[in-house]
């Protein structure tokens, strides 16, 4: 456990050597070693010392080094059988002896090192080789103890390089697992010594040494993922103290007591002026009284006493190394290495070097650090504490490296570093990037780059928001980051810089990350609801931090609480009482305040003014004292020394300088501290006295006005016998004294706002907080909290992006801005944030060329050539097409762009059409939509012909160039190219889709679009016409929900009609637009027929001049409407409008033909006659019959239409009779049909007086036909009397009058014909109705009326003569009538000869007409016979014959 646990023979870094070297064969190994022996001997022979001894050929004089090499040469070829079983020490040791010898020079030592390096890299021995561990150990030990004579600096550096080479090969070798923890520490120590010594050598050696060190760290920590945790890993001993940090308040840098980089120089340094120095890397023991510490000893001292260090390397050596790297940072601080101290090169100073090594370790170890508590603790405390300090360095290089480390820590260990990360963001990154604390531009840029790198991580902002902004104990890091980025993106009094672009990139990365997480389907509702009731907010916990179903509603709830807490804190800072009352009102504090709830409010709320809080806690009021004690109980002081606990306690508020308040505060603190840590102190009084003494010591040590400082002895003496009469341990008090002396207990006046500087007290609070904070929430790829975050960041992002977009010149920056704005548009639509989308549209529209004071020429050129204008235009219409559902007020700006494009004549011709749904769109129209091959621009065909105007643009100049009266220059090729490009841009924008696809818009957005079209139409007539066309197109495209917008559309069109006095294009479009809407929608919306047709009444409201101008076209459109939709119109209301329009055309010369065609289509053969439109059609037909516009045939046809309609009445009557069984209903329908018939009779009667003979006579004939058609109709009996009274009798009277008046003007023949027809009409009508009316009481009156009119006709003279035809016809008709009456029993002889009986009355009138008729109808014989048969005096008169 705790050591490397690889699969057999595997190592993560061995692949490098496998690629470069192949393992030698058994024979080759011996040959290779033999070669290396020869090489070493050859170099030795070149040396005078070794050469003389060799020449002497005296075995006794041969040196042991040479002898051992020769002996090895004798043996190697005998080992060829299996090198795996040969102890490596046998063939390694002779080379190591050369390395260890202090008699060899640098060249010899270098060759020996090369030989060892070759043996290691060629894998002569592996883990399976016997005694491999001992072999690896002696190699490391020998190289560490390398001795040689220095002859020249170059050879010395070569040896140092080869030392590094061999040590690195040891770690990279397959046999590296044979190294112990001690060996690894030795290797690292040795390399560090070379690194330091290289500072006085060449730059090449410096680079190689540092590179080797990085490689070592990478190799070592790359094994961390394969190492299992130790059972007792937390108990691993590290020589240096862990987590004990002293602070220098003056420099702001940490001090360290466990190392000094200068000691390395003292230990490893050689006299450069003395070339005879024998050792470059001497091993020297340092005495303690020299107060110098060698780096190697730091690691080795801890290793010597532990058996774990002798085991195969694993966690123990990694803990030592990582702790040492953290220590190196402390050493750097003590050595005061900063941007102003540059011993070699600034980028290679100790802190930067240490940070680079740490970064390498974290990169390779990655998430595996969390499996090892000791390493994790080093990161959480030591490392982060140093990072907080070096983050405030003036060096951009150091800050950059620190930020890289933090990024790696975030990516790999963020779940274990929640509070530390929050502190780094707040105290370092945000503070530096804010540029208000003396940071240089380079520092700000580095900090900004780090923030942007973090924002580019997919889950960063979501996790920051969930873990910090939604935690009441943490600051709002997400809001701070977004605000900072948005502010830094704004150029202030200067040009756009890289910083602005960088900040903008961070903002855009945030919104693009959100946009990538959202799905295609829109959420139903993502707005959380919270129950408003009192709850102890500090006790709210999540059941499962790993399940979004639990933590998402939890963090939203906490965020809701936090918002109210922040408001409460703000009010508390201004007025504590009002603040507490507010918190009670929002249910965060109970209705009756209790000390615990107020104390928890103080403890867990961010943003409180520490001064106000300190005054409250120090107040002598009893409730405040209770709150103070409850506040102290919220701290956990277990296992803390008193000084640390006091720092933590008083760091949460401002301790007042008033003695009584200090006393109360320290009393509460002491009571709590003693309760939890009663180990050394005997009672709480001792804790109180010591705490008070610490406060006094703090003032004494760090107050500038105190000249004589308290010494350690003074402090110890002052605290004698305070522990129940006994003294506290001297070591305990000494530790407290030095802690306070080196690091002040800072009680600054924190106002609760802004980014503060990290202090010792704050760091202690961070460590304390990290132990009790809630678990870190890891977010996945889902957009759980994106709505909440987007609502915060959208406004600032739009504003910042717009400013950068306005000032940027590079196209890639412009594209980046557009990408960000489109991401915002996507999110706004996804979360239904219409106001955000509207703001975005407004911002983008400002960058189009349509809102600038440009001429038409300039606008087209800008659109065609300027990238900013082009991108903005494309983005506006992309948003309108893709996210139009969620645009409200933004439609106004979009339509202004469309109107501007229309004025520039670069819109597609079909922009305002609904061609996709129009079945009658002609081929020619479709051809117009195709782009012309001619590059010369042509004015849109959709422009109204009645509105000729001269364009000021070069398009207009081109068209007008053909006019001989005007001479204007033709547009240049550049202008034409710009126009062509602009037209292509507009085409790619698919502006027509906005209106054609409006049928997919949500109701609210559609209504906003319609309203915007109406509002945009008031600027000029051309714009009004274009907007009206668009409005009509939108209406037609939304036929399935026409009621949603129709009232608004109709009101607008009605206003146009009523306010227009003369013909113009606008009113023309309005009228025919309504007709088109009705034509297109009636087939699909039968339930809206009445509503649509009612709208046509606006045509009736046209001014006379306007109506006259368009009457013919109106009639033609009505014909189309009727022919296409007659079967869909069922109600009287709908037909009333149609018939009214047709009736108007009857007297219009051009329109009457089309109007009558429509009427004939409706009435012919009763095709579309209905009870609901019957009377209306009769009236219209009457208008056409009476109208003298057109030929006589049209009037006759109109009369025929009326008379033929009687068959429809007969059919309806028969259908009613067959389908209705209820008598009442049948009677009602009969009455309605009767009324229609009577209406028919009356309307025909009116035409019977027409001045035109053909029309008049034909009308009488058709009236007779209509009356005759009543046989098939169930007419109520009283209706016949109405027919005679209101039609027949009046007709005869009027005809007679008409004939008399016109007898002088017309031929007697035509007058007689009319009288004859009228007489026949009355006679036939009477006979037809006789059966139905003879039994009615009014029959006698009607009969007398008939006789009177016959008598009048007989006696009337025309031009002094009676009409022969009339006088011949009437007796015949009367005779026929009397015979019918006789046959039917209506007229019978009466025996009341002297009375006024029906019989007598009849003959009284008949005899005046023709005296002979009585004898012809009733011969005397029949009369006598009738009287004899019925002579009974008592019989009453025949019924019905009374007058």
Curated annotation (Swiss-Prot):
Residues 917-949, 1424-1443 are annotated as: Disordered. Residues 554-743 form the SEC7 domain. It is found in: Cytoplasm, Cytosol; Golgi apparatus membrane. Residues 939-949 have a biased composition (Polar residues). It is a peripheral membrane protein. Disruption phenotype: Slightly abnormal Golgi stacks with laterally expanded cisternae. Abnormal formation of spherical bodies in the endoplasmic reticulum. GO terms for molecular function: guanyl-nucleotide exchange factor activity. CDD domains: Sec7. Transmembrane segments: none annotated. Keywords: Cytoplasm, Endocytosis, ER-Golgi transport, Golgi apparatus, Guanine-nucleotide releasing factor, Membrane, Protein transport, Transport. GO terms for biological process: endocytosis; ER body organization; protein transport; regulation of ARF protein signal transduction; retrograde vesicle-mediated transport, Golgi to endoplasmic reticulum. Homodimer. Activates the ARF proteins by exchanging bound GDP for free GTP. Plays a role in vesicular protein sorting. Acts as the major regulator of retrograde Golgi to endoplasmic reticulum trafficking but is also involved in the endocytosis process. Could function redundantly with GNOM. Regulates vesicle trafficking required for the coordinated polar localization of auxin efflux carriers which in turn determines the direction of auxin flow. Mediates the endocytosis of PIN2 from plasma membrane to endosomal compartments. Required for maintenance of endoplasmic reticulum morphology. PANTHER family: ARF GUANINE-NUCLEOTIDE EXCHANGE FACTOR GNL1, GUANYL-NUCLEOTIDE EXCHANGE FACTOR. This is ARF guanine-nucleotide exchange factor GNL1. The gene is GNL1.
């Amino acid at each position: 456990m705790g050591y490397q646990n690889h699969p057999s023979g595997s190592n993560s870094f061995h692949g490098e050597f496998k690629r470069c070297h192949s393992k030698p064969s058994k024979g080759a190994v011996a040959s290779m070693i033999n070669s290396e022996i020869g090489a070493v001997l050859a170099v030795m022979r070149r040396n005078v010392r070794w050469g003389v001894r060799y020449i002497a050929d005296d075995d006794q004089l041969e040196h042991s080094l040479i002898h051992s090499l020769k002996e090895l040469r004798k043996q190697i070829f005998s080992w060829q059988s299996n090198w795996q079983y040969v102890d490596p020490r046998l063939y390694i040791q002779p080379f190591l002896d050369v390395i260890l010898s202090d008699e060899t020079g640098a060249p010899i030592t270098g060759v020996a090192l090369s030989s060892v390096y070759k043996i290691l890299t060629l894998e002569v021995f592996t883990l399976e080789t016997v005694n491999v561990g001992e072999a690896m150990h002696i190699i490391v030990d020998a190289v560490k103890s390398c001795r040689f004579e220095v002859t020249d600096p170059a050879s010395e550096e070569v040896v140092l390089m080869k030392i590094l080479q061999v040590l690195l090969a040891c770690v990279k070798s397959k046999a590296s697992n044979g190294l112990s923890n001690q060996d690894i520490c030795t290797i690292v120590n040795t390399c560090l010594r070379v690194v330091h010594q290289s500072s006085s050598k060449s730059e090449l050696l410096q680079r190689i040494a540092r590179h080797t060190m990085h490689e070592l760290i990478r190799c070592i920590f790359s094994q961390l993922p394969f190492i299992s945790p130790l059972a007792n890993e937390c108990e691993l001993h590290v020589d240096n103290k862990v987590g004990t940090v002293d602070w220098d308040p003056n420099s702001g840098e940490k001090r360290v007591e466990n190392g000094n980089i200068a000691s390395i120089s003292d230990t490893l340094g050689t006299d450069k002026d003395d070339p005879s120095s024998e050792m470059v890397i001497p091993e020297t023991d340092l005495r303690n009284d020299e107060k110098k510490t060698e780096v190697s000893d730091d690691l080795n001292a801890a290793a010597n006493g532990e058996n774990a260090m002798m085991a195969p390397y694993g966690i123990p050596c990694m803990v030592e190394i990582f702790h040492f790297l953290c220590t190196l940072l402390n050493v750097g601080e003590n050595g005061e290495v900063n941007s102003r101290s540059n011993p070699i090169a600034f980028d290679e100073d100790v802190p930067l070097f240490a940070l680079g090594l740490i970064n390498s370790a974290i990169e390779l170890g990655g998430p595996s650090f969390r499996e090892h508590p000791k390493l994790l603790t080093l990161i959480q405390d030591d490392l982060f504490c140093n990072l907080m300090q070096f983050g405030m360095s003036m060096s951009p290089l150091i800050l950059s490296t620190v930020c890289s480390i933090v990024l790696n820590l975030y990516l790999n260990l963020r779940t274990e570093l929640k509070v530390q990360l929050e502190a780094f963001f707040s105290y370092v990154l945000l503070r530096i990037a804010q540029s208000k604390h003396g940071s240089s531009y380079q520092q700000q840029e580095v900090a900004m780059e780090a923030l942007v790198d973090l924002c580019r991580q997919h889950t960063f902002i979501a996790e920051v928001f969930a873990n910090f902004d939604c935690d009441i104990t943490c600051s709002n890091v997400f809001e701070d980051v977004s605000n900072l980025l948005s502010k830094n993106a704004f150029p202030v009094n200067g040009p756009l810089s890289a910083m602005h672009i960088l900040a903008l990139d961070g903002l855009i990365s945030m919104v693009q990350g959100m946009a990538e997480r959202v799905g295609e389907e829109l959420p139903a509702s993502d707005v959380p609801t919270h129950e408003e009731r009192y709850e102890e907010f500090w006790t709210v916990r999540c059941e499962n931090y790993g399940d979004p179903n639990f933590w998402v509603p939890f963090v939203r709830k906490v965020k809701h609480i936090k918002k109210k807490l922040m408001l409460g804190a703000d009010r508390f800072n201004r007025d504590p009482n009002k603040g507490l009352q507010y918190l009670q009102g929002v249910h965060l504090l109970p209705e009756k305040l209790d000390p615990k709830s107020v104390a928890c409010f103080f403890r867990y709320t961010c943003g409180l003014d520490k001064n106000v809080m300190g005054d409250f806690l120090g107040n002598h009021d009893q409730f405040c004292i209770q709150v103070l004690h409850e506040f102290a109980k919220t701290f956990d002081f277990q296992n803390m020394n008193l000084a640390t606990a006091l720092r933590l306690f008083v760091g949460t508020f401002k301790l007042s300088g008033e003695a009584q308040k200090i006393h109360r505060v320290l009393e509460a603190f002491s009571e709590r501290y003693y309760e939890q840590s009663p180990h050394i102190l005997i009672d709480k009084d001792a804790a109180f006295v010591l705490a008070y003494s610490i406060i006094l010591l703090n003032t004494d040590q760090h107050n500038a006005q105190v000249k004589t400082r308290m010494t350690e002895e003074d402090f110890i003496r002052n605290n004698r016998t305070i522990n129940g009469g006994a003294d506290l341990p001297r070591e305990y008090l000494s530790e407290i004294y030095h802690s306070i002396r080196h690091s002040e207990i800072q009680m600054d006046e924190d106002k609760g706002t802004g980014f503060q500087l990290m202090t010792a007290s704050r760091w202690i609070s961070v460590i304390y907080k990290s132990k009790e904070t809630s678990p870190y929430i890891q977010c996945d790829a889902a957009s759980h909290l994106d709505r909440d975050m987007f609502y915060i960041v959208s406004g600032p992002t739009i504003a910042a992006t717009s400013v950068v977009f306005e000032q940027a010149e590079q196209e890639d920056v412009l594209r980046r801005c557009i990408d960000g704005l489109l991401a915002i548009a996507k999110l706004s639509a996804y979360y239904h944030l219409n106001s955000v989308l509207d703001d975005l549209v407004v911002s983008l529209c400002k960058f189009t060329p349509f809102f600038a004071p440009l001429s038409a020429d300039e606008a087209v050129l800008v659109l065609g050539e300027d990238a900013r204008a082009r991108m903005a235009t494309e983005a506006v219409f992309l948003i309108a097409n893709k996210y139009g559902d969620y645009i409200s007020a933004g439609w106004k700006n979009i339509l202004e762009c469309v109107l501007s494009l229309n004025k520039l004549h670069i819109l597609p011709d079909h922009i305002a059409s609904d061609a996709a749904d129009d079945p009658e769109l002609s081929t020619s129209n479709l051809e117009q939509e195709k782009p012309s091959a001619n590059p010369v621009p042509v004015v849109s065909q959709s422009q109204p012909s009645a509105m000729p105007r001269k364009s000021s643009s070069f398009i207009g100049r081109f068209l007008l160039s053909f006019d001989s009266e005007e001479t204007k220059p033709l547009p240049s090729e550049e202008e034409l190219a710009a126009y062509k490009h602009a037209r292509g841009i507009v085409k790619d924008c698919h502006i027509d889709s906005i209106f054609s696809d409006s049928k997919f818009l949500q109701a609210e957005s559609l209504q906003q679009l319609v309203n915007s079209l109406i509002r945009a139409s008031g600027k000029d007539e051309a714009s009004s016409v274009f907007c009206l066309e668009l409005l009509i197109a939108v209406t037609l495209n939304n036929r399935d929900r026409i009621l949603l917008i129709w009232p608004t559309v109709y009101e607008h069109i009605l206003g146009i009609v009523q306010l227009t006095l003369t013909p113009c294009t606008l009113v023309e479009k309005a009228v025919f637009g309504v007709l088109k809407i009705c034509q297109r929608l009636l087939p699909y919306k039968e339930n809206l027929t009445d509503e649509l047709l009612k709208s046509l009444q606006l045509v009736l409201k046209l001014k006379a001049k306007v109506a006259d101008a368009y009457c013919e076209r109106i009639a033609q459109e009505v014909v189309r409407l009727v022919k296409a939709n007659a079967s869909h119109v069922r109600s009287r209301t709908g037909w009333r409008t149609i018939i009214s329009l047709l009736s108007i055309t009857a007297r219009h010369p051009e329109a009457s033909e089309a109007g009558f065609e429509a009427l004939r289509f409706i009435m012919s053969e009763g095709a579309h006659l209905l009870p609901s439109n019957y009377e209306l059609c009769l009236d219209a037909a009457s208008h056409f019959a009476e109208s003298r516009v057109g030929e006589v045939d049209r009037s006759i046809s109109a009369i025929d239409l009326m008379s033929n309609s009687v068959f429809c009445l007969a059919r309806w009557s028969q259908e009613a009779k067959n389908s209705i069984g209820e008598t009442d209903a049948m009677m009602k329908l009969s009455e309605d049909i009767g009324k229609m018939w009577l209406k028919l009779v009356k309307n025909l009667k009116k035409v019977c007086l027409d001045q035109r003979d053909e029309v008049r006579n034909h009308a009488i004939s058709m009236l007779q036909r209509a009356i005759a058609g009543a046989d098939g109709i169930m007419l109520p009996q009283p209706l016949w009397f109405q027919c005679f009274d209101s039609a027949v009798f009046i007709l005869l009277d009027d005809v007679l009058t008409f004939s008399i008046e016109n007898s002088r003007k017309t031929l007697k023949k035509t007058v007689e014909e009319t009288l004859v027809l009228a007489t026949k009409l009355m006679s036939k009508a009477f006979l037809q109705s006789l059966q139905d009316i003879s039994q009615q009481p009014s029959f006698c009156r009607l009969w007398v009326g008939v006789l009177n009119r016959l008598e009048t006709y007989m006696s009337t003279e025309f031009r002094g003569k009676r009409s022969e035809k009339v006088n011949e016809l009437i007796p015949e008709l009367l005779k026929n009538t009397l015979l019918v009456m006789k046959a039917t029993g209506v007229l019978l002889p009466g025996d009341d000869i002297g009375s006024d009986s029906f019989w007598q009355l009849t003959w009284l009138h008949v005899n005046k007409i023709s005296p002979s008729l009585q004898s012809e109808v009733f011969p005397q014989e029949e009369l006598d016979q009738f009287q004899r048969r019925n002579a009974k005096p008592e019989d009453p008169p025949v019924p019905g014959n009374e007058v």
